[in-house]
Amino acid sequence: MTEHSRDTPQFYLTAPSPCPYLPGKEERKVFTHLVGERAGALNDVLTQGGFRRSQSIAYRPACEGCRACISVRICVDDFVPSRSFRRTLKENEDLIGALRPPSPTSEQYGLFRSYVTSRHGSGGMADMSVLDYAMMVEDTHVQTRLVEYRRRGPDSRINGRGTGDLFAVALTDILGDGLSMVYSFYNPNIPERSLGTFLILDHIAKAKEMGMPYVYLGYWVNGSRKMDYKRRFLPQERLSPHGWERVDE
């Protein structure tokens, strides 16, 4: 292997497979491996170009005749929570999200199983074993953290950690210009808390505290109901063939 081939990422194209978002469509992906000392820098550049990370792979859609998957990132500095978002923040003000190393636990996996069974019982994640979950968390060569959400305790202001049961978890990459929410899951039995929305709102707050301009949400899929929630977080930027374009309403 030459010096050039080691330093230059190699990209590959998957075979067509059924689209998980739009019935009757097929998807293809272009992907590369995120390994070695330059994995973090490469992940930054690729995320800014519309890629997503899954374990040690960065990928983006490359579907023939379809451009429904659009990369979305929230503009942190200009974000103002709506009335419904403020209600969600109020409902969850007793929770705190603690950043931890990407180390899986049986408690996390139990919550993950409850979430997947409730929300994605027939999806590809339904069959994930505890070892599969551990790989999803640990197989990273970039700056990744787990954000664990628990109730605030008497020492939370000092140590930044909560106490008691685990309510939610977010697998998050720390990029040069923001936070990328790789995957999140939460207790599905307390819908009144709107925990999925709260996790995004809390990541916006965390990014602002860290001086980062963006929270990357992955793909908004035009025509997919389960991805439609991403449109609610405004202002945001969406990646087009002409670059990132701001959307305010």
Curated annotation (Swiss-Prot):
<dbReference type="GO" id="GO:0071596">
    <property type="term" value="P:ubiquitin-dependent protein catabolic process via the N-end rule pathway"/>
</dbReference>
<dbReference type="GO" id="GO:0008914">
    <property type="term" value="F:leucyl-tRNA--protein transferase activity"/>
</dbReference>
<comment type="function">
    <text>Functions in the N-end rule pathway of protein degradation where it conjugates Leu from its aminoacyl-tRNA to the N-termini of proteins containing an N-terminal aspartate or glutamate.</text>
</comment>
<keyword id="KW-0963">Cytoplasm</keyword>
<dbReference type="Pfam" id="PF04377">
    <property type="entry name" value="ATE_C"/>
</dbReference>
<dbReference type="InterPro" id="IPR007472">
    <property type="entry name" value="N-end_Aminoacyl_Trfase_C"/>
</dbReference>
<dbReference type="InterPro" id="IPR030700">
    <property type="entry name" value="N-end_Aminoacyl_Trfase"/>
</dbReference>
<protein>
    <recommendedName>
        <fullName>Aspartate/glutamate leucyltransferase</fullName>
        <ecNumber>2.3.2.29</ecNumber>
    </recommendedName>
</protein>
<keyword id="KW-0808">Transferase</keyword>
<dbReference type="InterPro" id="IPR017138">
    <property type="entry name" value="Asp_Glu_LeuTrfase"/>
</dbReference>
<dbReference type="GO" id="GO:0005737">
    <property type="term" value="C:cytoplasm"/>
</dbReference>
<dbReference type="Pfam" id="PF04376">
    <property type="entry name" value="ATE_N"/>
</dbReference>
<dbReference type="InterPro" id="IPR007471">
    <property type="entry name" value="N-end_Aminoacyl_Trfase_N"/>
</dbReference>
<dbReference type="GO" id="GO:0004057">
    <property type="term" value="F:arginyl-tRNA--protein transferase activity"/>
</dbReference>
<comment type="similarity">
    <text>Belongs to the R-transferase family. Bpt subfamily.</text>
</comment>
<keyword id="KW-0012">Acyltransferase</keyword>
<dbReference type="InterPro" id="IPR016181">
    <property type="entry name" value="Acyl_CoA_acyltransferase"/>
</dbReference>
